Amino acid sequence: MKILFFSHGKRANGGAERCLLDLVKGLKQARESWEIYVVFPAKDELWEMTRPYLSGYAFIRQPWWLVRPKKRNWQKRLLFNLKKHSAIRKTRDYIREIKPDITITNTLATPIGAIASHAENIPHDWFIHEIPELARNLTYLFCEDSCLEKISSLSQRILVPSDFAGKYYTNKLSSPEKIDVVYQSVEVNPLKRTEPGQSFTIGMLGNFEPNKGQHIAIEALREVVKKYPDTRLLLIGGNNSRYAQELEKRITEYNLRQNVSIVAHTVHPHDYLIQADAALVCSGFECFGRVIVEGLKCGLPVIVPDKPFGQELIKEGYNGFLYNRESSGDLAKKIILLRQTGHLPEMKQNALKSVENRFSIPTFAEDFISIINSKKV
């Protein structure tokens, strides 16, 4: 079996990219004879980390049909149309070179791989990790209905990472019978546990961007320290964005320098997360709650928004808490509740129990293999 994946990301800081890395590892472990190829947009850490498992790779920049809402204009549409022909041609050339049995686009962000596969008469599957309408950080460059129709028509199967995403796209796509849910793996191998006697610490893992909601965590911490001045917030995933600069200003303005620690993007985030007493998620939306599972696998209760992606994994008071994302005050109350509860050690054990024998690389790979070997009507 020869499989060709199309990746829109070059770094390993996104859920879709980390999913691809785990999937490539798992497939190679489960089916050593299979040949796996990936088209990356550029040479970077994702290429470096997946390379040991690949039979080949190519670097082809594929234009996106998902853009920031403020950049949805005729100029962007023109630029996409100008770039797509070259990208399709290069992708078709690579498909002819390696002759894959199946191709898989690992994102909703670009249709180039699907279009090229269709032109070369190669079966194509789409692995969708995004729901733009709900995330609101990206939007379709062209008419949403026409894009969704292309997704249906250019795919023999459409994979999604959660039951919630499956229900959403069942109501959106013209061929809902093509949809399969496959829960991805989350590999966590942290080095050490919390140091005895350290201040109560909340860990938050995620790239610094508005949808991830680091600003909400800071607003909540501002309230928490009024009651518990020693509470610490560990933010993992820092970058040099304008949003990150705004967070820095807010931390200074609120006099929280002694309470907030920032760790830049790292390929080993769990070594930091496991130092916390609990994990926090402030995302407005997640197609799959990967960061929630990461917290649970680190043995941490997780405080998450009271939304479908949180409700699917967290049971109130058992392995975490749910809160109203529109209210930093409600989040502050849940953090204080976690500090005051006498059941924190028990909740940590429950966190591990709730993901025991779940979300493993071997299971992910076998589920994926079963799906791609199945016949769609």
Model region roles, listed by residue range:
Residues 14-25, 200, 207-226, 245, ...:
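A conserved mid-protein helix/loop that constitutes part of the nucleotide-sugar donor-binding site
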Residues 38-45, 186, 205, 232-246:
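Glycosyltransferase donor-sugar binding loop
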Residues 86-87, 123-125, 131-154:
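Nucleotide-sugar donor phosphate/pyrophosphate-binding loop at the beta->alpha transition
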Residues 164, 185:
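Carbohydrate-associated surface elements
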Residues 265, 284:
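Aromatic "clamp/platform" in nucleotide-sugar-dependent glycosyltransferases that forms part
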Residues 301-305:
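Short hydrophobic beta-strand element within catalytic cores of glycosyltransferases
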Residues 316-317, 321-328, 337-342:
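Conserved acidic donor-binding segment of nucleotide-sugar-dependent glycosyltransferases
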Residues 343-358, 367-370:
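A short, well-ordered alpha-helix in the C-terminal region of glycosyltransferases
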